[in-house]
């Protein structure tokens, strides 16, 4: 993660995620590109893959914060975005779960929606918060089930402070 998920950054990310402040994505993307953009560009044919949310959660929020972040990073860095990964099963909110509970909850929760448009290259999963790794692992697993050779890395806006 580019930043620790604590104090003011935590408040800001919660506004971005839960309070409709999707315009924050542009500022976050500028900071992510400034601090870690060279890392993202070093991969072979990198493309951005936002971690999907379930359609019910999308209806509640009106947007997917990871997709907003990926689109803003795409504009800033010129990297393509592929939104062919889908959340096929709605899961309970993960915030209060242990790492083991998160892993169990996310088993089989992702799938490939659009294989035809799937680029060749390194998939960079984009998300707002890295907590236990369960979400990015489940996304990578879904991608590798369909394309075993797929290189998958992740780039998050924040990482929970207790993990550093």
Predicted feature locations:
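Extended interfacial segments that mediate partner engagement and assembly in macromolecular machines
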Residues: 1-67, 71-75, 95
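PRPP/pyrophosphate-binding module of the type I phosphoribosyltransferase fold
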Residues: 82-164
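Short, glycine- and charge-enriched coil/turn segments that flank and shape catalytic ligand pockets
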Residues: 37-46, 78, 113-122
């Amino acid at each position: 993660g580019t930043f620790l998920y604590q104090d003011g950054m935590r408040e800001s990310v919660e506004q971005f995620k839960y309070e409709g402040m999707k315009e924050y994505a542009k500022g976050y993307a500028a900071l992510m590109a400034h601090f870690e953009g060279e890392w993202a560009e070093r991969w072979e044919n990198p493309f951005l893959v936002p971690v999907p949310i379930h359609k019910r959660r999308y209806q509640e929020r009106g947007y997917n914060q990871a997709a907003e972040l990926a689109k803003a990073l795409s504009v800033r860095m010129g990297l393509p975005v592929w939104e062919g990964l889908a959340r096929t099963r709605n899961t309970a909110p993960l915030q209060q779960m242990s790492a083991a509970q998160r892993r169990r909850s996310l088993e089989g929760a992702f799938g490939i929606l659009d294989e035809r448009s799937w680029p060749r290259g390194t998939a960079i999963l984009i998300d707002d918060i890295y907590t236990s790794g369960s979400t990015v692992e489940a996304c990578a697993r879904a991608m590798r089930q369909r394309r075993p050779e797929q290189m998958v890395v992740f780039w998050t806006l924040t990482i929970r402070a207790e993990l550093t």
